[in-house]
């Protein structure tokens, strides 16, 4: 909370917010860019909204947390919240507007109900906007130059169950063409009423790698195509430069863990259509980082990415920004298997053992929960996020009707020997060992 953390942040932070014109906004050289990036991360830490420590939360819990944070700050002068429609099940879908500038910007998050990382980040940005000191130059200059509208939770029914689809079972991000769902119509109506120059399509993805042999992707970026030819018109070109600005900032924090999302044209998707409708749109996909199962570090990095992007729009530096940091990113590669156990022997119910590799796919690859069997057999050439050599060890599965079934729930113990009482090396899922 600000009350305890803000005063103790010291002269360094205070100096960042009291810098003269053009220091936080403007093209000011590498040293000041680094200083500005540090300031954005300080904002992410100092204004983190309590009550959102886990990435699964409901519509009511989210708005209660946001309301508490904004209420403490008496945000009514700086922040406007309005209902823009209701979901299939009647939950309120709200838009938040900040700033009063001539350039309209639209951000929307959690159109997939189980993709909540940026939803948390938007709460933190709103908290900063409402509670930062009156002489906070960054906020004041953003407010003068941009009008920012956020829809933090577009699919509250999906969020209620923490599932991708809405209450009709529809992927809202595949309804931009038909507009059959209320959630899709709401987003389209807001876009049409604002006619935003820039859009941010905020999502989460599974466990992908940066290139075929790269690191786990923390964040993937995309300037979506507006047509089958994937042409680079002026609207998409601006999104490309904006993606480059974000990529350069993130590379400083998680080098090697940024990737470029596939830009094949998807005629039903909102990002592609936003581009086609004239809004320069960037897709930000929050992936996974080691030791970050609740995506709290990615929450922090989304604050950095969004504030970096907004600042580049506001100060005009975007117009001359290089696309190279985006163009040079490795491709975002989907990995079929989360884990492969290689080189061991699988012990069946009759005690016989067989030289079989075992692939495992998690229902939640980030938290590594819900393990299920993938392919079984010779997987020497299979790609996985993690491959564990279990040569000389024995895999003892709990069998489903005497069989190992692809897609079946994994309950497996790795032991030193074929004897079911031999020493335990590992259990999947992990439990207290014998």
Question: What annotation goes with each model-predicted range?
Answer:
Residues 28, 84, 132-136:
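Catalytic-site microenvironment of enzymes
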Residues 102-111, 115-259, 275:
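Active-site/substrate-binding loop(s) of hydrolase catalytic cores
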Residues 28-58, 194, 219-434:
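C-terminal accessory segments enriched in acidic
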Residues 81, 95, 150, 199, ...:
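Conserved beta-strand scaffold positions in the cores of enzyme catalytic domains, especially
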Residues 1-2, 28:
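Short hydrophobic transmembrane-like helices used for membrane targeting/insertion
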Residues 9-23:
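Bacterial N-terminal signal peptides
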Residues 54-103:
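Soluble metallo-hydrolase cores and metallopeptidase-like ectodomains found primarily
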């Amino acid at each position: 909370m600000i009350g305890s953390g803000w005063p103790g942040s010291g002269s360094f932070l205070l100096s960042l917010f009291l810098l003269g014109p053009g220091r936080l906004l403007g093209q000011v050289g590498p040293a000041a860019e680094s200083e500005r990036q540090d300031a954005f991360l300080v904002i992410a830490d100092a204004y983190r909204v309590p009550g959102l420590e886990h990435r699964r939360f409901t519509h009511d819990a989210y708005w209660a947390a946001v309301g508490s944070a904004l209420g403490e700050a008496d945000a009514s002068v700086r922040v406007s919240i309005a209902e823009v429609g209701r979901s299939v099940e009647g939950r309120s879908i709200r838009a938040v507007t900040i700033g009063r500038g001539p350039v309209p910007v639209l951000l929307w998050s959690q159109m997939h109900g189980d993709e909540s990382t940026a939803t948390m980040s938007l709460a933190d940005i709103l908290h900063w906007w409402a509670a930062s000191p009156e002489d906070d130059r960054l906020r004041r200059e953003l407010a003068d130059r941009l009008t920012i509208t956020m829809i933090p939770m577009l699919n509250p029914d999906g969020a209620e169950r923490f599932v991708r689809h809405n209450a009709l079972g529809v992927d809202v991000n595949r309804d931009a063409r038909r507009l059959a769902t209320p959630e899709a119509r709401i987003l389209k109506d807001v876009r049409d009423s604002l006619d935003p120059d820039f859009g941010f399509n905020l999502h989460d993805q599974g466990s992908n790698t940066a290139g075929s042999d790269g690191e786990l992707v923390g964040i993937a970026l995309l300037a979506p195509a507006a047509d089958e030819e994937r042409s680079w018109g002026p609207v998409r070109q601006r999104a490309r430069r904006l993606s480059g600005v974000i990529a350069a900032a993130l590379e400083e924090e998680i080098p090697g863990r940024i990737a470029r999302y596939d830009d094949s044209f998807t005629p039903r998707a909102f990002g592609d259509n936003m581009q086609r409708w004239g809004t320069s749109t960037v897709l930000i996909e929050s992936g996974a980082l080691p030791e970050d199962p609740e995506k709290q570090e990615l929450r922090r990095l989304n604050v950095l990415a969004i504030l970096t992007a907004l600042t580049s729009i506001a100060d005009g530096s975007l117009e001359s920004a290089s696309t190279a940091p985006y163009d040079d990113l490795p491709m975002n590669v989907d990995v079929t298997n989360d884990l492969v156990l290689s080189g061991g022997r699988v012990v069946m119910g009759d005690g016989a053992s067989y030289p079989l590799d075992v692939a495992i796919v998690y229902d939640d690859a980030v938290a590594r929960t819900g393990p299920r069997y993938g392919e079984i057999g010779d997987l020497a050439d299979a790609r996985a996020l993690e491959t564990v050599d279990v040569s000389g060890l024995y895999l003892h599965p709990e069998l489903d009707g005497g069989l190992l079934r692809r897609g079946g729930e994994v309950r497996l113990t790795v032991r030193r020997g074929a004897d079911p009482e031999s020493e335990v090396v590992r259990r999947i899922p992990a439990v207290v060992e014998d």
